[in-house]
Design a protein with these regions (language model features):
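Hydrophobic alpha-helical segments
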Residues: 1-165
Length: 165
């Protein structure tokens, strides 16, 4: 490769959106997310629980775009201000979150953090009392898809617009 073959650098490297750069890959994410949500619904997991997973994963990853979006979607699904606000400290929040929600959040965190195999096995086994196999699989898929979309948004520097009110 010669200097003449080297592409010119972008004027604004922060104005590079992965979803726009490879739209075919981005368009494949939508059906994957839909399939994960459908699996959750078929397993008997409600929209509030799915939004708790989306929010917690986005908190762990620090994705402001997804946090903004899923905070609004969680509120639209009926999550209270209290449950939205306490989510970062869900372990200390006691009865604010049900046993099923706590197991779901534990599993979603493990999917996001990918601990050592022994710890992952422990989390999967310990959450089995509160989640069926279908629910466990759905939670893991929802968390994996959210991790994917978080990474796309973070790497693309997707902006968050201020909303008053």
């Amino acid at each position: 490769m010669t200097a003449a073959d080297t592409p010119a650098p972008r004027q604004d490297p922060l104005a590079f959106f992965l979803d726009k750069a490879v739209p075919e890959a981005w368009h494949a994410v939508g059906p994957l997310a839909s399939a994960a949500r459908a699996a959750a619904e078929q397993a008997g997991l409600d929209r509030q629980l799915v939004e708790l997973v989306n929010l917690r994963v986005s908190q762990l990853n620090g994705c402001v775009f997804c946090l903004d979006r899923h905070t609004r979607q969680g509120a639209d699904a009926g999550l209270s201000v209290q449950r939205l606000g306490l989510l970062p400290a869900w372990r200390e929040a006691g009865a604010v979150y049900s046993e099923q929600e706590r197991a779901t959040l534990e599993l979603a965190e493990a999917v996001t953090d990918l601990p050592e195999q022994e710890q992952l096995n422990y989390v999967q086994a310990s959450t089995a009392a509160a989640l069926t196999d279908a629910q466990s699989a759905a939670v893991q898929w929802v968390a994996m898809v959210m991790n994917l979309t978080n990474r796309i948004s973070i790497l693309s520097h997707h902006p968050v617009r201020r909303r008053d009110g």
